[in-house]
């Protein structure tokens, strides 16, 4: 079983101006998908810039367990010798996906239409997260799932021996659910159709096309209609993974709120389905310039030049939530340093992430002297242009909560401690060194 070592408290103190280049790790969403699609292609896929956080390493291990040869050649440089669509072999061991909701749900989708059985588990946080939202649509293909009460891990999936194509409307915007259904559809005959009422991040669609799948996206009265033709032969690719906009959010937001800062963040994905935070920050008055805009691996990228800014509160519309679902914790920190109310609506999905992120941010911000209002679906931050700080904040084993409160401490009047900084390694292992290199005052304990 996945475990968790001793807690590693960390403290951030008010920092001088942040200066320099922030080299962000590769995008987590694209890294997971590159490994999985590489394993389902016939031949060798080469990947550069792969994120080597624990979540992605767990997906690499899972692909090995299903029979693909996954080799690391150097930092970020990997190759995957795929076994083809329908070529997975039954794993001999339990598949441990650690902390990764994305990893477990995508891998479940990838194996769901093969005639084999696999058992999945994860760490204490992942074992609390509901899997029914993925196993319900997979059941339509003929997959059977046996999990703990409430559809939780550990869970055994019995893949469909004779899968049927599926037409599925995603009930709650979720790129993970959409992607799991599309990956399952690869080994089903005929056409699998996924309907989204609200668009979510589209890395799976872009990458499936890149690997040679026949996939179309049309807008109809029901929403976005994605049609995938099953049982293609996927062709191996060379994948250059752009830098992760969700990880870039932390140094970007730190530079906005730490007085006198100016940083450059090169090569960040500007995928429009992931751009909600940057749209919101610009509305708040952030000084962010997008330089050297270009395309890499089918994804738009740019270098971000960020300067400290006087910010004002804004209302974030609910329809923006899918394009920034992982960024609300750090946005709520920025909102605390803005002048006026920031109202974030349509955020109930945050309650079933690695932690209940609305509750975790609300309690931590209140402890730091910020006035908060919340209900099931809304978070309101009363920005005062300054934050007293001086608190210890609970991270609930959630990497984004940990990084958000450390950024808060860099600009607060008194130091801010997080009870455990170790989960940061799941998505951004170099976060502490990177921020310290820019001038942040961070220390263990």
Curated annotation (Swiss-Prot):
Catalyzes the transfer of the enolpyruvyl moiety of phosphoenolpyruvate (PEP) to the 5-hydroxyl of shikimate-3-phosphate (S3P) to produce enolpyruvyl shikimate-3-phosphate and inorganic phosphate. This is 3-phosphoshikimate 1-carboxyvinyltransferase. Belongs to the EPSP synthase family. It comes from the Bacteria. One of its GO terms (biological process) is chorismate biosynthetic process. Monomer. Its EC number is 2.5.1.19. Phosphoenolpyruvate binds at residues 28, 101, 129, 176, 357, 400. It catalyses: 3-phosphoshikimate + phosphoenolpyruvate = 5-O-(1-carboxyvinyl)-3-phosphoshikimate + phosphate. Residues 1-25 are annotated as: Disordered. NCBIfam families: aroA (TIGR01356). The active site is at 326 (proton acceptor). PROSITE patterns: EPSP_SYNTHASE_1, EPSP_SYNTHASE_2. It is found in: Cytoplasm. Pathway: Metabolic intermediate biosynthesis; chorismate biosynthesis; chorismate from D-erythrose 4-phosphate and phosphoenolpyruvate: step 6/7. Keywords: Amino-acid biosynthesis, Aromatic amino acid biosynthesis, Cytoplasm, Transferase. Its main location: cytoplasm.
């Amino acid at each position: 079983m996945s475990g968790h070592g001793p807690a590693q408290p960390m403290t951030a103190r008010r920092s001088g101006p942040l200066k320099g280049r922030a080299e962000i790790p590769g995008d987590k969403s694209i890294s997971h998908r590159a490994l999985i699609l590489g394993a389902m292609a016939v031949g060798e896929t080469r990947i550069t810039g792969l994120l080597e956080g624990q979540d992605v390493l767990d997906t690499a291990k899972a692909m090995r367990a299903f029979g693909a040869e996954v080799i690391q050649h150097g930092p970020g440089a990997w190759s995957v010798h795929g076994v083809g669509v329908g070529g997975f072999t039954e794993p001999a061991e339990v598949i441990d996906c650690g902390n990764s909701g994305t990893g477990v749900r995508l891998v479940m989708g990838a194996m769901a239409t093969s005639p084999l059985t696999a058992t999945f588990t994860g760490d204490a946080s992942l074992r609390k997260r509901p899997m029914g939202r993925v196993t319900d649509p997979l059941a339509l293909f003929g997959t059977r799932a046996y999990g703990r009460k409430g559809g939780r891990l550990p869970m055994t999936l019995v893949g469909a021996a004779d899968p049927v194509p599926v037409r599925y409307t995603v009930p709650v915007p979720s790129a993970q659910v959409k992607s799991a259904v599309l990956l399952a559809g690869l080994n089903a005959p005929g056409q699998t159709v996924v309907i989204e009422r609200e668009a979510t991040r589209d890395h799976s669609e872009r990458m499936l096309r890149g690997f040679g799948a026949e996939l179309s996206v049309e807008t109809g009265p029901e929403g976005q209609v994605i049609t995938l033709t099953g049982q293609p032969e996927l062709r191996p690719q060379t994948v250059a993974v752009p830098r992760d906009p969700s990880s870039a959010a932390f140094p970007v937001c730190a530079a906005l709120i730490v007085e006198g800062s100016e940083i450059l963040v090169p090569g960040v994905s500007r995928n429009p389905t992931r751009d909600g935070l940057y749209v919101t920050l610009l509305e708040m008055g952030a000084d962010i310039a997008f330089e050297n805009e270009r395309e890499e691996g089918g994804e738009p990228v740019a270098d971000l030049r960020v300067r400290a800014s006087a910010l004002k509160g804004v209302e974030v519309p609910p329809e923006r939530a899918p394009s920034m679902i992982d960024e609300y914790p750090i946005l709520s920190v920025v909102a605390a340093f803005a002048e006026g109310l920031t109202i974030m609506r349509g955020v109930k999905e945050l309650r079933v992430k690695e932690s209940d992120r609305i509750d975790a941010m609300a309690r931590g911000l209140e402890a730091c002297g910020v006035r908060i209002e919340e209900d099931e679906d809304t978070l309101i931050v009363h920005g005062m242009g300054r934050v007293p700080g001086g608190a210890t904040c609970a991270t609930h084993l959630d990497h984004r909560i940990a990084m958000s409160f450390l950024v808060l401490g860099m600009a607060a009047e008194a130091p801010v401690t997080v009870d455990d900084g170790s989960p940061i390694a799941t998505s951004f292992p170099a976060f502490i060194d990177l921020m310290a290199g820019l001038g942040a005052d961070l220390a263990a304990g």
